[in-house]
């Protein structure tokens, strides 16, 4: 499609470090070319938004069974921000986002901060806002982790169940430092190769490849 309806309105992303001593980025700034209300839904009217994403969360949630039948709903506990370091990353991310939106390039655009709101200042106030509004950003992973004591084997087979494989983001032991769509597609393609018995030679990066 063409125009705004033909896109997902997330036009750009930036990767930054919440602390200068980090070896790699741990925070993603997501720029949205639309007015997003608190909670993530699109609002009516002109606007833009900047979302803050912690790329390497240390908090761990859980999914447990609530009964013995397939109709019993699982018990899902995201356990968000159970590790205090995740909160610190998001606080620094909000501060960085505010600095970006106060840059000269945004002068004269007529924007006003809707959330957290300019009245929310200081660590304690930001922490309270984040605790009340944090979410998974639709990227939960790891509920069927591929690891020695995990749900699936290196061939994506569910341990203890014949003929069943899992090929989605749930097999990732930890989340990728970015959106999960592309690696999830790769997992599906790899699963198809495993089922077909097709083996490809491992890709080797060029010797002169530079990494960030």
Which residues are covered by each model-predicted region?
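FAD-dependent oxidoreductase catalytic-site/capping-region signature
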Residues: 2-183, 191-212
């Amino acid at each position: 499609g063409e125009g705004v309806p033909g896109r997902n309105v997330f036009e750009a992303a930036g990767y930054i470090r919440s602390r200068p001593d980090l070896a790699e980025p741990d925070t993603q700034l997501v720029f949205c070319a639309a007015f997003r209300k608190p909670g993530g839904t699109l609002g009516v009217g002109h606007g833009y938004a900047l979302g803050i994403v912690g790329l390497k969360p240390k908090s761990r949630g859980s999914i447990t069974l609530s009964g013995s039948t397939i109709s019993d709903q699982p018990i899902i506990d995201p356990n968000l921000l159970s590790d205090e370091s995740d909160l610190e990353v998001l606080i620094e991310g909000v501060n960085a986002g505010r600095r970006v939106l106060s840059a000269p390039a945004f002068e004269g655009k007529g924007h006003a901060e809707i959330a957290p709101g300019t009245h929310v200042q200081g660590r304690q106030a930001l922490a309270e806002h984040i605790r009340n509004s944090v979410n998974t950003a639709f990227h939960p992973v790891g509920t069927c982790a591929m690891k020695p004591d995990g749900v699936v084997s290196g061939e994506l087979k569910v341990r203890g169940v014949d003929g069943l494989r899992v090929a989605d983001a749930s097999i990732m032991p930890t989340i990728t430092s970015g959106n999960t769509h592309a690696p999830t597609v790769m997992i599906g393609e790899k699963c198809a190769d495993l089922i077909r018995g097709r083996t490809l030679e491992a890709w080797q990066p060029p010797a002169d490849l530079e990494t960030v």
